[in-house]
Amino acid sequence: MNFVFWQSILEKYWGISSKLSLLDGEFDLNILVRSTDDEQYVLKIMREDCLQDFVDMQIQAINHLKSIELKLPFPNIIQTISGKEFIHCKDEFGNNRLLWLIKKLPGQKYVEFKRKNLNLVKELGRMIAKCDDALESFEHDFLNRSLKWNLIEAYWVEKHIDLIEDPSRKVIVQNIIKEYKNILPKLREQPFQAIHGDINDHNILVAGGLKDQPYISGILDFGDMCHCPRVCNLAIAAAYVVLDHDQPLSLIHI
């Protein structure tokens, strides 16, 4: 990656002089930006075929949450010098890209945090409830797209079940699919709204030193937002929070 090129882009559009390093990203490029005045940001360089509505949905959702002043730890959108929240730009190879910049939140990923406790789980539950309350009034056309990670559409996995070579694992998945089909009609009857849709252990940040009470310092990645039964947001988060716990069901009942 040509960091010098992206440094020039940040200087041109955001007026930020910086040092850059690459962060993790599934489809898009995420660059950690350390400015010369000791501020930290994340430059999000979207995949070449990224739809503008995809970025707009995320930005509008974050702005919506911020406008309600819940004091929840979501990143601030950093506007360009000209007041834009995202820009179209060619990369160093001449490919069209969508770019946007957010303020970096403190903390480390929940999956990497060693001092997990019940207070963190309770705090996360309260935070999800507040987030869901706020997103109940959020609307965007892109929320209604077809999305594999929308739990209402989860039946798509059935046609791929023969890819599972381990017979015992295949039976587990088959049983889950059967149970899913049984509850799907009732799930469709639940209240629908905009949800985050991907509050997993890589999208939750935790901060706090050895002597401090750890706390949820950030929720990231609004890219899997969708219009879905509200309860699905809590179910998704619970599925990840219980990982590596000896008594997972007792944990989500607190």
Please identify what each model-predicted range represents:
Residues 2-12, 136-140, 155-197, 207-214:
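An alpha-helical support segment within catalytic cores of ATP-dependent transferases
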Residues 10-17, 69-73, 187:
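Short secondary-structure junctions
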Residues 15-31:
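ATP-binding glycine-rich phosphate-binding loop
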Residues 26-36, 42, 77, 181-232:
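Active-site acidic catalytic loop and adjacent metal/ATP-binding pocket
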Residues 36-139:
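ATP-binding pocket architecture of kinase catalytic cores
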Residues 75-79, 84-100, 154-161, 194-197, ...:
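Structured catalytic core of nucleotide-sugar glycosyltransferases
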Residues 112-168, 190:
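A cross-family kinase active-site recognition segment
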Residues 230-252:
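Active-site activation/catalytic loop segments of kinase-like enzymes and analogous catalytic loops
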